[in-house]
């Protein structure tokens, strides 16, 4: 019994060390060091097309009307600099027809105004995609809601389309489950305020909605993956829609 007890203690200690060193903790986001990057009154520090973006009742609002339908996705971009390792918290509300997302470690396209290419924490009004990791204008879906995935290392650059099938990156290994997509969907409120918490450190990206982990990606693809880039919020092409974002706070490491 003494040997078993000591053995269990040693195993527990190893687990605690591993968790502390290698797994970003959601609770870290509640610590000090967060900076508010949207003042709730103006678009100071942000840049986008005023046809689609405005401030209303303390929220950053992206809206498409019947008179302003889009031909391509549009972003409002945070001009506070590039982000590398960080945590981001915010709240969102989106109409049922809505399609949006929070882009990070993204690249601004030179030939298209207010267009970003990069990782995205997906948001949509039907909650079909909310919480997943989607790479805009690049490798497409890296993890569906409920998945823990590892993106395989690539040996050489090549056409991305060679590794995309059904709008998902095929060079991906699912290494674990965070719960079924349908069960996690029940935790996301429709047309009401939901909380987003992103933890991005090294090649690990965790997407939380309402304090529940929705997707977990480890990106070992050094050719196509990005270690830093821009932050932005998307309005997606499609029917009229509205997304509201508030209480945007960033903590950089």
Regions found by a protein language model. Name each.
Residues 1-12:
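Bacterial N-terminal signal peptides that target proteins for export
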Residues 19-20:
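C-terminal motif of bacterial Sec signal peptides marking the signal peptidase cleavage site
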Residues 23-253:
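Carbohydrate-interacting regions of secretory-pathway proteins
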């Amino acid at each position: 019994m003494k040997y078993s007890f000591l053995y269990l203690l040693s195993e527990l200690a190893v687990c605690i060390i591993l968790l502390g060193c290698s797994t970003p903790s959601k609770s870290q986001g509640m610590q000090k060091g967060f900076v508010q990057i949207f003042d709730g009154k103006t678009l100071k520090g942000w840049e986008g097309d005023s046809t689609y973006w405005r401030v209303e009742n303390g929220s950053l609002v992206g809206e498409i009307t019947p008179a302003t339908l889009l031909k391509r996705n549009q972003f409002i971009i945070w001009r506070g600099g590039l982000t590398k390792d960080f945590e981001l918290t915010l709240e969102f509300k989106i109409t049922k027809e809505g399609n949006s997302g929070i882009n990070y470690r993204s690249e601004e396209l030179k030939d298209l105004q207010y267009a970003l290419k990069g990782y995205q924490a997906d948001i949509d009004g039907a909650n079909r995609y909310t919480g997943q990791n989607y790479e805009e204008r690049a490798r497409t879906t890296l993890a569906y809601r409920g998945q823990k995935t590892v993106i395989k290392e690539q040996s050489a650059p090549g056409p991305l389309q060679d590794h995309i099938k059904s709008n998902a990156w095929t060079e991906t290994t699912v290494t674990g489950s965070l719960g079924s997509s349908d069960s996690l969907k029940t935790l996301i409120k429709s047309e009401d305020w939901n909380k987003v918490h992103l933890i991005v450190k090294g090649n690990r990206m965790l997407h939380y909605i309402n304090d529940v982990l929705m997707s977990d990606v480890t990106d070992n693809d050094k050719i196509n993956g990005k270690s830093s880039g821009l932050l932005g919020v998307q309005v997606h092409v499609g029917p009229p829609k509205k997304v509201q974002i508030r209480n945007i706070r960033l903590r950089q490491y």
